[in-house]
């Protein structure tokens, strides 16, 4: 079996890559400006890149693609929040609590989730209120609006600041997990395993009926089912798509594609072609390396970059 790929980069389209990079290095000081394959880039200390392609017009963020947002671990998310409050170039995004229009700017300021879910349904909120459950006010996740209308998460508390995840929507999260395991040999992310004995024949399950809070939308969000895999130390986290319309290709959107690193591109091409995976682009030169572009289960564009 070929070893699982590593996470190489997230590729964004931007009207001003230099300004975008300056924003991220200011607010996530562990990062640094760099370049890769002739493209401006942001480097995270865990050997992860965010690459930028300059575009003439603001890149679209709708209709919804499989790529929802990306995020960082931070050492103290509440301290980060207070820092960002004082910075005029940061737009903090409210998390709605499901309690008569209430909102907070960090999840630890509202009722904690339960059962491994990062939110509560309205009946669970009523129960938490009746039992006088209190916010933890420690750590938590929060969001800001980044350059080009990027949705950027920061979450704590963790040992070090680093780029740590890309959050997706999937048509069928359990099926997506099986797809990534089968075709990309991806390890399952701890705590997000699919139900036992799940197969491609049984992986399609109904979206949970109840929306949960806190959420970026006032009406809440669907968090069930959820699944995830991990490449290196970057998690691919999945919820089912929130709307009724199928997810579209991300190419040309703000979040254009995601790249994984492999040691032997030819071996991966042979494996994936033999398994019937759809190729979006045949092998091509990328800087001093080579790459190929494939399509994931919900139309996400995945670039495999040869890194020897």
Predicted regions and their residues:
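Conserved acetyl-CoA-binding loop of GNAT-fold acetyltransferases
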Residues: 26-33, 88-91, 182-188, 277-278
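Short, solvent-exposed beta-strand edge segments and adjacent coil->beta transition regions
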Residues: 5-9, 65-69, 161-165, 253-257
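Helix N-cap motif at beta-to-alpha junctions
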Residues: 15-17, 74-79, 172-173, 262-266
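Solenoidal tandem-repeat scaffolds enriched in leucines and small polar residues
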Residues: 172-196
């Amino acid at each position: 079996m070929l070893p699982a790929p590593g996470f190489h980069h997230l590729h964004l389209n931007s009207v001003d890559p230099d300004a975008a990079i300056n924003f991220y290095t200011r607010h996530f000081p562990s990062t640094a400006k760099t370049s890769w394959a002739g493209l401006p880039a942001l480097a995270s200390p865990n050997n992860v890149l965010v690459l930028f392609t300059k575009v003439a017009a603001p890149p679209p963020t709708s209709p919804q693609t499989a790529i929802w947002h990306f995020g960082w671990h931070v050492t103290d998310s509440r301290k980060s929040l207070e820092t960002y409050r004082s910075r005029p170039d940061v737009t903090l995004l409210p998390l709605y609590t499901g309690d008569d229009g209430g909102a907070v700017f960090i999840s630890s300021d509202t009722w904690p989730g339960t059962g491994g879910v990062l939110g509560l349904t309205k009946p669970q909120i009523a129960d938490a209120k009746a039992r006088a459950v209190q916010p933890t006010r420690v750590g938590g996740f929060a969001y800001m609006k980044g350059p080009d209308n990027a949705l950027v998460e920061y979450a704590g508390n963790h040992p070090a600041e680093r780029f740590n995840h890309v959050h997706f929507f999937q048509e069928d999260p359990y099926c997506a997990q099986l797809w990534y395991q089968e075709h990309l040999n991806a390890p399952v992310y701890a705590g997000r395993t699919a139900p036992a004995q799940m197969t491609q024949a049984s992986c399609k399950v109904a979206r949970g009926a109840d929306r949960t809070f806190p959420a970026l939308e006032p009406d809440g969000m669907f968090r069930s089912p959820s699944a995830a895999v991990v490449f290196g130390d970057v998690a691919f986290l999945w919820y089912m798509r929130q709307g009724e319309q199928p997810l579209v290709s991300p190419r040309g959107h703000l979040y254009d594609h995601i790249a994984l690193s492999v040691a032997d591109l030819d071996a991966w091409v042979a494996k994936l072609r033999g398994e019937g995976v759809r190729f979006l682009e045949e092998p091509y030169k990328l800087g001093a390396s080579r790459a190929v572009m494939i399509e994931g289960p919900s139309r996400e564009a995945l670039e495999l970059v040869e890194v020897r």
